[in-house]
Amino acid sequence: FLVNPETAFAPFHTALTGITAEMVAQSPTFPVLWETIGPILDSGLLVAHNAPFDLSVLGRCLRDYGIFFHRQVPYACTCQMIRRLLPQLPNHRLDTLCQYLHLELDHHQAGSDSRACGQILLHLMDTGASLSPFMRTYDFIRIGTVRPSRNR
């Protein structure tokens, strides 16, 4: 999805993503797009690379637009997984990981990044890695990860 940010476009973001102000000028604004993506967040596990950052941006966007989203969303972060499961990699960037696993990636393009994260998760599951230590919950009211309780 492309979204009209309703703000000035920073050259840094265009250089990073290749997305220009012209490309999003006729795109829906976030509140309109939320009608489509909100139900997706209600449907299962969210998987992203550096997920806490992406979720915090989404949470602040919801707050700034005055959109109430009551959910605590289960998520898994492929960056956190790879740090622990593949420590031999030179870094834990998504493009490095995709190259290592021979996955196609058009970096910083949301659809491609999302597909890659799904493929990474499937790869880790196929190798028998235990993913339960990486399952987290994000609270969109507090805009933060819910810390697991520790029983003593």
Task: Identify the residue ranges that each predicted region occupies.
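A short, structure-level motif marking secondary-structure boundaries and short turns
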Residues: 43-44, 78-81, 124
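Conserved non-catalytic scaffold segment of RNase H-like nuclease domains
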Residues: 1-73, 87-108, 148
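Conserved beta-strand -> loop -> alpha-helix junction used to position metal-binding or nucleic-acid-contacting
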Residues: 70-82
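Generic alpha-helical structural context detector
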Residues: 80-83, 99, 119-122
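Acidic two-metal-ion nuclease catalytic site recognized across multiple nuclease folds
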Residues: 120-152
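Acidic, divalent-metal-coordinating active-site segment for phosphoryl/phosphodiester hydrolysis
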Residues: 110-123
